From Swiss-Prot:
Its EC number is 1.8.4.11. The gene is msrA. This is Peptide methionine sulfoxide reductase MsrA. Keywords: Oxidoreductase. The active site is at C16. Belongs to the MsrA Met sulfoxide reductase family. NCBIfam families: msrA. It holds the Pfam family PMSR. Signal peptide: none annotated. One of its GO terms (cellular component) is cytoplasm. Coiled coil: none annotated. Has an important function as a repair enzyme for proteins that have been inactivated by oxidation. Catalyzes the reversible oxidation-reduction of methionine sulfoxide in proteins to methionine. HAMAP family: MsrA.
Length: 164
């Protein structure tokens, strides 16, 4: 059907959410990104609370994409390209439980594709993959100053190579 868009949503955690958001916002077919805190145990956490390590949240990037342009498999392939899925609670120089890697899905129908993708990537590493895969239970938007941070601050910190 011409003109019909097939929107899908996923949240990806890959260390500091600034770089993950900027990276995915540049991909054709991604129509929206937002950063926030995913799958913790407290209500409406602040950045400071998440950084203190007592909330259980990961820094995540909500991604809405048009599946008629880019599929979930391609989104996940790009995700694996920017993380080290064998390191627990760290990406680049960022260390802490909030910097763990994770794939958080809304649609249960996506789970098989996610697990297949994780299995495929595991064949490229000698160490086990520690990237968690969970259904989204909680997602709270991060404070406004975190949204599109690297667009507002082009020379800001980023652990991801955005020149790819």
């Amino acid at each position: 059907m011409k003109g019909v868009k097939f929107m899908k949503e996923i949240i990806l955690a890959g260390g500091c959410f600034w770089g993950v958001e900027e990276y995915f916002s540049r991909i054709y077919g991604v129509v929206d990104t937002k950063v926030g805190y995913v799958n913790g145990v407290t209500k409406n956490p602040s950045y400071e609370e998440v950084c203190n390590g007592n909330t259980g949240y990961a820094e995540g990037c909500y991604i809405k994409f048009d599946e008629s342009i880019i599929g979930l498999k391609r989104i996940l392939d790009k995700f694996w390209d920017i993380i080290d899925p064998t390191i627990l609670n760290r990406q680049g120089p960022d260390v802490g439980h909030q910097y763990r890697t994770g794939i958080y899905y809304y649609d249960k129908e996506d789970l098989d594709d996610i697990l297949k993708s994780k299995d495929e990537i595991s064949k490229k590493y000698d160490k086990p993959i520690v990237t968690e895969v969970e259904k989204v239970t909680y997602f709270y938007l991060a404070e406004e100053y975190h949204q599109k941070y690297l667009k507002k601050n082009p020379n800001g910190y980023c652990h991801i190579n955005l020149d790819n």
